[in-house]
Amino acid sequence: MTLTGGAFRKIGFMPIDAKLPQGLSRSFFLPVAEALGFGESRRKCPVIEDLDWLMAGTTRALASVVSGRHFLQTIVEEVASAWERTTYFEALKSKRRLDLLREINEFVCRVTMRTVLPDRLAGIPGLENYDVYAGDGHWHEHATHDPRRGRKGGKGEDKNHRIHVATGHVFGLNLRTRAVVHLAHCDEKTKIKEHDMGVLKRLDRDVLRQGAAKGRKVIWIWDPAGISYTQWYKWKASAGIYFLSRPKTNMIINHVADRPWDKADPINVGVERDGLLTEGPQTPIRLVVFRDPATGKQYKFITNIMDLAPGVIAQLYRMRWDIEKIFDSFKNKLMETKAWAKTTVAKSMQANFMCLATNLATLFEHQIEQEHGVSNAPETKRRAQRREKEKTEVEENGKELPILHQTLVRATQTSVKFIRWLLCHLWKPTSWEAALKPLRRSYATL
């Protein structure tokens, strides 16, 4: 998949949407078929066609299967004709298929989701020229056949003792569209647990820009593991990439030069200080101090973004929690708690299929709501009630909630009810009316 000036170049293959199955699965996988038309790594494979491979891998990420053999014996026959065990596991190690999978998810994130889904940050002033992402690392259990690599050192322990190393990945979440992207697989061969900043420094700047148009700025919101003032300066100066984080617990902040900010603006409710660090970093670093009116807890944020209101800075970091909800969904809804295979390619394949499955589910949930009027209305109502209760309690204490905290009430993840319904009905040859009936009932009663 080629990006030229921010546009994808279509590859000269015949249209393949006719190969899609009928029923719900056709609508669910249609974005994949559309993206395949732009896939440079696409090939005509007589054993496992690329479309079948992509549908099968996405289905495995959605399904609660405990192993590849379990998947082959139960789920895969719904997707395509039965595959040989060795053929499937060899395909998991294919660098070409991994490249194609990345291209497909890239197209779905950068084109389909940006076109179809509403902009969740549209109501925040000052962000018109920014793409905003939350990023973090996520770890799960090693593969069954992973060799013991790490050394468990420490006082009183055998320094030659070999241990299994957990599988780690670094992901990003587009806060405008909820698109999930896989940034990198963490180094397991030389490190027991690679630090987030070590992974970030390995990434090409184009990966961090995520296809942003020339002249457009990109914000990454990270926990304290993403702090490096020197690296922040390099990314900002060379690629227009900005970072927002919270100070590390051992970080001493004594000298701050105050910056002017509008204390009457409802956006800045809760802000106690906005200033520049004047000692330590060579590059300008901004400090925002915020106290949550609901809990009374004080938070400090550091960033190299200088042109956003301090209340916007606080709200953006609050939204970083959305990526933690994605990780919770990986673990407790998709049940992806263990690596599929031992090779680096296969582990990256799994992570990208987890992203693609999540993104397709987000698109499909939106489509069903828009075209059929089916949504999780009871949960939306409960969310609004919780927010109204919080607002009332704060006002009773003589305070007020920040305006952005009141208006940006949104779902942060796809519900487990929808995931269960999707997996149950995805491959059934049933009508939309028959398939949506149990979803309506689930939303209303469960």
Residue ranges and their predicted role:
Residues 1-69, 79, 100-113, 123-126, ...:
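Dynamic "connector" segments at or just before major functional cores
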Residues 1-47, 256, 260-290, 359-446:
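A short, flexible helix-boundary coil/loop motif
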Residues 80-98:
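Major-groove recognition helix of helix-turn-helix-like DNA-binding domains
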Residues 92-175:
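Active-site-proximal, Lys/Arg-enriched surface segment
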Residues 185-297:
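An internal, acidic/charged active-site-proximal segment
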Residues 299-321:
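Extended, non-catalytic structural segments that build the interaction scaffolds
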Residues 313-341:
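Short amphipathic alpha-helical "interface-anchor" segments enriched in bulky aromatics
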Residues 341-366:
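Basic, amphipathic alpha-helical segments enriched in Lys/Arg and hydrophobic/aromatic residues
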